[in-house]
Amino acid sequence: MIGSITGNVEEIRDSYIILNVGNIGYIIYVSHKVLQTCKVGDNIKLYIETYVNRDNITQLYGFLNRQEQDYFKMLVTINGINYKTALSILSKLSPEQIFSAVVNNDKIAFKGNGIGEKLAGRIITELQYKINKMPIEETFSIIENDDSLAALISLGYEKLKAFNVIQEIKSKTPDASTQEVIRKALQKLSQ
């Protein structure tokens, strides 16, 4: 298995790039966001997921960071989501936007590209469970640096519920100290 590949972008196509590594060109499927940030000749590092399709053809999927790769891996475990669909979701939504959509139960964020309301609901339900099980440091940067969220999680509150309450408090009182946010969150969560 391949964990990551570093090389020069040789070609950019509609859904993949050809990455030249040691004079070998690897076809790597990437999100539209990656396609837009790459230029021919760029030296980039991609984290790789390997998939062998029904015809026994190996396909490589590349991500600029582990966070995007982690969300991709979670998405493909959901019934009805294949690699192509997961990549189209990541083309449309960043991991932070996926997290926010899950927290806010926003089915509309996932709809489109063959995803209807029922599948969008399944995505939200299954990701709520999977995100709550992820270690806090793997969720994403705004969670990593949030002491108030870390405090609530250490007290046993669910990550998504605590995050939602903290975001609500911070939107109403953006200058609140960490202690104030924790106090208000505990009041709200104990109701």
Swiss-Prot record:
Positions of region (Domain II): 65-142
Keyword tags: Cytoplasm, DNA damage, DNA recombination, DNA repair, DNA-binding
Major localisation: cytoplasm
Region (Domain III): 146-191
Function, as annotated: The RuvA-RuvB-RuvC complex processes Holliday junction (HJ) DNA during genetic recombination and DNA repair, while the RuvA-RuvB complex plays an important role in the rescue of blocked DNA replication forks via replication fork reversal (RFR). RuvA specifically binds to HJ cruciform DNA, conferring on it an open structure. The RuvB hexamer acts as an ATP-dependent pump, pulling dsDNA into and through the RuvAB complex. HJ branch migration allows RuvC to scan DNA until it finds its consensus sequence, where it cleaves and resolves the cruciform DNA.
Alphabetized HAMAP family for the sequence: DNA_HJ_migration_RuvA
Name of the featured protein: Holliday junction branch migration complex subunit RuvA
Organism: Ehrlichia ruminantium (strain Gardel)
